[in-house]
A protein has these predicted regions:
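Basic/aromatic-rich interaction segments and small domains that mediate binding to polyanionic partners
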Residues: 2-64
Length: 64
């Protein structure tokens, strides 16, 4: 599955910050992630207390 910038996603797992699991956020990346981020998507707007996180595709589910 691929995401687009602005997609709302639910974080089902997150090695970067386990506090983000179960929360929703917005994908920031305008292009598919590459080696610089270890092929992880940048997800923002999770919580005021949680900074943007990097998540692999299998850790995210697209919200409707």
């Amino acid at each position: 599955m691929s995401f687009q910038a602005g997609d709302i996603v639910r974080i089902v797992a997150c090695a970067d910050d386990p506090r983000a699991v179960g929360k929703t956020g917005r994908v920031l990346d305008e292009v598919p992630p590459g080696p610089l981020t270890d092929y992880r998507w940048t997800v923002d707007r999770i919580s005021i207390w949680i900074a943007p996180v990097l998540c692999h595709t299998h850790e995210l589910r697209k919200e409707n």
